[in-house]
């Protein structure tokens, strides 16, 4: 099985988009990319906007090769909407290229969903239904694609139990010799998700960590995330790719240090330098103004 991480916070944008090739089936997972419109009270720096365009081009390139597209939930960093969005680098043309003629395995648009995502799901389906090859609501279901199985979890909370951000579905890809789980915005904060991952016993887990950058609003999430991921590591011995929300926090290397097995970011998996641009937005704006700043990565 071939796994290609496409876009994420360690690559400079908000995303967990991944391309997987298994048994001749090409699968694009969560094909969205976005920037946080405000961080430290600041809009995205110029280099963030440039990186967003670069990641968009990469996602479109892999979309052209994909047979199957999966969507874990309807936030714009996990699917590409059909409107022109500056901070999503989205357009109808991009969306059509991703979804037209594809098998879409997607989070249920009406069950276990909050109001905001229900509206987004309705808009998505209105545009995707006429152009997709087939659309299946994937929650809790398994699909056999000629020797490759895609098994989806039941809907689990986006973060901790009772999260107002709604629900997501995880996906297990099994080609008979290797098992990979993509667990997008579980944030390692709810038991249902942790237990499902342990039960499925993957060889590789791709997941997003807790949103510790939110400070008081995410109180206790650091400790819970460490505890839950260490449990997954002990029970499965899976290789871990950890990225997304946790990498919006400058302290993410310390989080990685507390784990019993050190994960890789998307950048680390690709053997390139981590560039957590959003976490360093304040410094990037100063740099744009010609001020001298220290950054833990190269720019330009």
Swiss-Prot record:
SUPFAM superfamilies: Metallo-hydrolase/oxidoreductase. Coiled coil: none annotated. Gene3D superfamilies: Ribonuclease Z/Hydroxyacylglutathione hydrolase-like (3.60.15.10). Transmembrane segments: none annotated. It holds the Pfam family Lactamase_B_2. HAMAP family: UPF0282. Belongs to the UPF0282 family. This is UPF0282 protein TGAM_0379. The lineage of its organism: Archaea, Methanobacteriati, Methanobacteriota, Thermococci, Thermococcales.
């Amino acid at each position: 099985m071939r796994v290609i991480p496409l876009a994420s916070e360690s690559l400079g944008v908000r995303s967990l988009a991944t391309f997987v090739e298994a048994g001749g089936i090409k699968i694009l997972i969560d094909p969205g990319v976005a920037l946080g419109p405000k961080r430290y009270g600041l809009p995205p720096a110029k280099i963030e906007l440039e990186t967003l365009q670069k990641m968009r081009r990469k996602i479109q390139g892999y979309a052209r090769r994909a047979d199957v597209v999966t969507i874990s939930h309807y936030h714009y960093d996990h699917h590409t909407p059909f409107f022109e969005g500056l901070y999503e680098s989205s357009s109808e043309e991009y969306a059509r290229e991703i979804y037209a003629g594809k098998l879409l395995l997607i989070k249920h648009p009406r069950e276990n969903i909050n109001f905001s995502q229900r509206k987004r799901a309705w808009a998505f389906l209105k545009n995707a239904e006429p152009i997709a090859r087939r659309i299946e609501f994937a929650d809790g279901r398994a699909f056999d694609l000629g020797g490759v199985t895609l098994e989806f979890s039941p809907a689990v909370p986006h973060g901790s139990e009772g999260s107002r951000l709604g629900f997501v579905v995880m996906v297990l890809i099994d080609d008979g010799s290797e098992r990979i789980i993509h667990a997008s915005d579980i944030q390692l904060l709810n038991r249902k998700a942790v237990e499902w991952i342990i039960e499925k016993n993957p060889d590789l887990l791709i997941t997003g960590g807790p949103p510790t950058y939110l400070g008081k609003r995410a109180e206790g999430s650091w400790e819970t995330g460490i505890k839950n991921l260490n449990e997954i590591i002990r029970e499965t011995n899976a290789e871990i790719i950890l990225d997304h929300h946790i990498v919006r926090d400058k302290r993410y290397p310390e989080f990685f240090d507390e784990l019993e097995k050190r994960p890789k970011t998307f950048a680390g998996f690709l053997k390139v330098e981590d560039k957590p641009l959003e976490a360093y937005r304040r410094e990037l704006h100063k740099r744009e103004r010609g001020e001298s700043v220290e950054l833990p990565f190269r720019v330009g």
